[in-house]
Design a protein with these regions (language model features):
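Short, well-ordered coil/turn segments that N-cap beta-strands
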Residues: 127-129, 151-156, 197-198, 237-239, ...
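Hydrophobic faces of well-ordered beta-strands that scaffold small-molecule active sites
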Residues: 70-76, 130-131, 157-161, 200-202, ...
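Short, acidic/polar
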Residues: 111-119, 178-192, 246-250
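Active-site gating/metal-coordination segments in enzymes
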Residues: 168-228
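Active-site gating loops and adjacent loop-to-helix segments of metal-dependent hydrolytic enzymes
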Residues: 80-111, 153, 161, 165-173, ...
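Active-site core of metal-dependent hydrolases
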Residues: 167, 206-292
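Histidine-rich, glycine-flanked metal-binding segment
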Residues: 3-10, 19, 23-68
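Metal-associated gating/positioning segment near the N- to mid-region
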Residues: 66-146, 257
C-alpha cells in the first residue's frame, strides 16, 4: 500500500490482534501488537506482552480482530466492475459503441474515475498489489503514478495499458492495440513502453467475453512470430509479458514465443508443464501460470 509522503497525523499501535502470516505452514500468531510509525511503515510486530507502546502513539484495541498480509491480484481490469456483461454490449456492434465512448473526450474522464474507484475498492478489500492486463488507454498508468507520488491512496500497480491483439481479435477495439505483422507488433509494444507501462499483455487466443460462436474462446489468434516480436521488444526493457491463452495449443504457442505468464490457462500435459519450467525465451528462463 502506498501512502502520502506527508506524515500521518498519528502513529499507532494495534494491540492484542491475531495475525495470519500467510506462510506455507499456515502459522497463526495470537495476542500480537503491530506498531506503525508516522511514515506509515510497520516498525514492530511482537507479542503484546513484550511490546512497549510509545505514549505518543494512538492505541487501537485489536482484540478479536484478524490481521493478514496484503493480497495480490495478478490479473485485473480496472475499467470493469466485474458484473455480468449486458448481452447487447457483447455483440460486435455493442463492443464498437462501448469502445467509441470509452476513447472519446467524454469517455476518458469517465474511465479515469472508474479505474480510481475500482482501485480504491480493491484496496479497501485488502488487496495491496495489482497487475492490470488490458486497459482502455493509459488511465491506469496515470493512476499508478499518482499513487506512487503520494497524491492519492491506492494499491501498488503494475499497469499494462492496452493489450496486444490481432485486428478484430480478443479485446479489440476497446482495450487493444492491433497489429498484423511482427513489425507492427513491435511498434505497438514500443508505444506502450513509451507511455510508461510496466506490464505487457497479449491476446494469444480468443476469449469468452467477446466470443461470437462456440469454439472461438481458446482458438489461437496470434502467430508465434508476432508474439515472439512482442516478447523480444518488452524483454529488452525488463518488462514481463502475459498472454491470454485458453487452450493447450494457445498455451504452447505462447510459451514458444517466450511469454512469461500464461493467463487463465487450460489443461496442461507433461510437455507443457516442462515448457513452463524451462523456457529459454522467457525473461527469467521460466514461465508461470496465473489461473483465473
Amino acid at each position: 500500500m502506498m501512502l502520502s509522503h506527508n506524515p500521518i497525523v498519528e502513529p499507532f499501535a494495534l494491540a492484542h490482534a491475531t495475525i495470519v502470516t500467510g506462510d506455507k505452514a499456515g502459522t497463526i500468531l495470537r495476542n500480537m501488537t503491530i506498531v506503525v510509525g508516522a511514515d506509515g511503515r510497520i516498525e514492530q510486530v511482537a507479542p503484546s506482552i513484550e511490546t512497549s507502546i510509545p505514549a505518543e502513539y494512538h492505541y487501537l484495541d485489536g482484540t478479536g480482530k484478524i490481521v493478514m498480509p496484503g493480497l495480490i491480484n495478478a490479473h485485473t481490469h480496472l475499467f470493469s466492475q466485474g458484473k455480468p456483461l449486458n448481452p447487447k454490449l457483447a455483440t460486435p456492434k455493442g463492443q464498437r459503441m462501448v469502445a467509441t465512448f470509452a476513447h472519446s473526450p467524454l469517455g476518458k474522464p469517465y474511465m479515469a474515475a472508474t479505474v480510481r474507484h475500482n482501485a480504491t475498492t480493491l484496496l479497501e478489500s485488502g488487496v495491496t498489489t495489482i497487475r492490470t492486463l488490458g486497459d482502455v488507454g493509459y488511465e491506469v498508468v496515470t493512476l499508478r503514478d499518482q499513487i506512487d507520488a503520494g497524491q492519492i491512496l491506492g494499491p501498488r500497480i503494475l499497469a499494462s495499458g492496452p493489450l496486444m491483439a490481432i485486428p478484430e481479435g480478443h479485446g479489440a477495439p476497446l482495450i487493444a492495440l492491433t497489429s498484423g505483422t511482427p513489425e507492427e507488433a513491435r511498434t505497438a509494444v514500443a508505444q506502450n513502453l513509451k507511455a510508461g507501462v510496466n506490464a505487457i499483455k497479449i491476446a494469444a487466443t480468443g476469449g469468452v467475453t467477446d466470443a461470437q460462436e462456440i469454439g472461438e474462446a481458446g482458438s489461437p489468434q496470434m502467430s508465434v512470430e508476432q508474439m515472439r516480436a512482442i516478447c523480444d521488444e518488452a524483454h529488452q526493457y525488463g518488462v514481463i509479458v502475459g498472454a491470454h491463452a485458453q487452450s493447450p495449443e494457445g498455451v504452447r504457442r505462447s510459451l514458444l514465443a517466450g511469454v512469461d505468464t500464461i493467463e487463465h490457462g487450460s489443461v496442461l500435459d507433461d510437455e507443457l508443464i516442462g515448457m513452463f519450467r524451462h523456457n529459454p525465451n522467457a525473461l527469467r528462463g521460466y514461465s508461470a501460470l496465473v489461473p483465473t
